[in-house]
Amino acid sequence: MAAVVSAKPLCDSEPAIPAPPSVKEDNSNDTKDPEENSNDGSQPAKRRRMSGDSTPSCENSNQDFGSSYFPAENVIEYKWPPDETGEYYMLQEQVSEYLGVTSFKRKYPDLERRDLSHKEKLYLRELNVITETQCTLGLTALRSDEVIDLMIKEYPAKHAEYSVILQEKERQRITDHYKEYSQLQQQNTQKVEAGKVPEYIKKAAKKAAEFNSNLNRERMEERRAYFDLQTHIIQVPQGKYKILPSEMTKVSPYPVSLIPGQFQEYYKRYSPNELRYLPLNTALYEPPLDPLDPELLALDSDGDSDEVEEMKSEKKKTKGSSVRLSIDSSSMNMSESDNTQDTQEETPQPRPKVKEKSSTPRKEGSKRSVLSKSVSGYKPKSIPNAICGICLKGKDANKKGRSERLIHCSQCDNSGHPSCLDMSAELVAVIKKYPWQCMECKTCIICGQPHHEEEMMFCDTCDRGYHTFCVGLGALPSGRWICDCCQKVPATPKKGARKVKNSKEG
């Protein structure tokens, strides 16, 4: 029993050295029972055979383990092809021996592998990685990054051992490189002449300047922005701005009023053209048109903008002439009122009021100019062979088969029967007194613009067009609407007053 116990530690001990036959076995064999020794010798022989069989089996296992041991420094990582485009590989045979895996390909079939070419084998032979006999065999290459990942996941102890070897190799490489550099430096210092030192200094300064310029250029072009790992924000350099002198940016003693009515030095200067758009009392100009309005763009593309400008110029001319006529008529009325006071009481004549509404003086003048233009001897257009645009018939027959005169647009050649246009006789009588416009040519009386058709409304008495914002309305009115021109038409004198005047004159 002592021999069996002594054999187990030998199997668990270091595998390199086999255990010699112990003295305890001989002593145990000598001190056995005399009955066993008195036998034919078969029993002791059997026991010797069993003990002899058990001990060599342990020795064989130790020898196998010792032969399978592969040190980490023998695992070589190389680059193929050796130029800049190469990748790092390891030999599958070395990795399998180091990890102790016999069937490495069957155990890890997903790893990327390839067969070594003849040139690659010769390259490894020059590096003393493989022997001449291994050059004739079929070798397999594995990607080094996949092997390292496999060792980290499944063989951490092997990876720790291999990483220590890599660190030692890196230290040795740095040491050798430093030794070579120091030797070259010693050789160069011995060869340097005293007269060439200024030239070397200039070359060193030039190279340093080139390096600094390249570094600054990379910072400005390639590495301007960077990612902040703490805030996860991409930081971008701020742009350059021109700085004004301190005299121009100096703050005044009263920069802004803190309470309403307090003095402040800052104020905005408005031009006369800008003030006409502001509602100080009432805006004199209509709201400015949107330059990106599709209707306005289409109008400009069709060439109608010239017609609109001509209409504006004509209205300005007629406006000036109407103002002169109104002033002349007012002066004539003033002289007549001074001479004939009794006739003024019987036949009152309308006198233009200058300040009828303090808020809208210019609008009243423009409306009166339109009224005077429409009243002063206007004759409607006459087209002999005109055709109604609705029923497509002439003046001999309308849509009801009756003869009816056509009304004509003052801007274009469109014509139509009043019955087809749903116009009453009173409206037709008023239309003939001023240049009437059809629906396609209709413009606002105040601003003279054809735009904003959805905000255009028409007088029920004279059919003139007005924008809601030109007359101060927020929306289209519902029901009957009469413009100011029709509401302020001067009253016609009575027949009795005319007879009295004639009798007095007679």
UniProtKB/Swiss-Prot annotation:
Alphabetized CDD domains for the sequence: PHD1_PHF10 (cd15528), PHD2_PHF10 (cd15529), WH_NTD_PHF10 (cd21085)
Gene3D superfamilies in the cross-refs: Zinc/RING finger domain, C3HC4 (zinc finger)
Molecular function GO terms recorded: zinc ion binding
Compositional bias (Basic and acidic residues): 23-35, 353-367
Example GO BP: nervous system development
Pfam families: PHD
SUPFAM superfamilies from the UniProt entry: FYVE/PHD zinc finger
Cellular component per GO, a single term: npBAF complex
Residue segments, region SAY: 90-299
Bias type Polar residues, positions: 52-66
Region Disordered, residue ranges: 1-66, 293-377
Low complexity bias spans: 326-338
Family stated for the protein in its record: Belongs to the SAYP family.
Role according to the record: Involved in transcription activity regulation by chromatin remodeling in the context of the neural progenitors-specific chromatin remodeling complex (npBAF complex). May play a role in the proliferation of neural progenitors.
Family matches, as PANTHER family: HL01030P-RELATED (PTHR45888), PHD FINGER PROTEIN 10 (PTHR45888:SF4)
Record protein name field: PHD finger protein 10
Species name: Xenopus laevis
Lineage: Eukaryota, Metazoa, Chordata, Craniata, Vertebrata
Designated gene of the protein: phf10
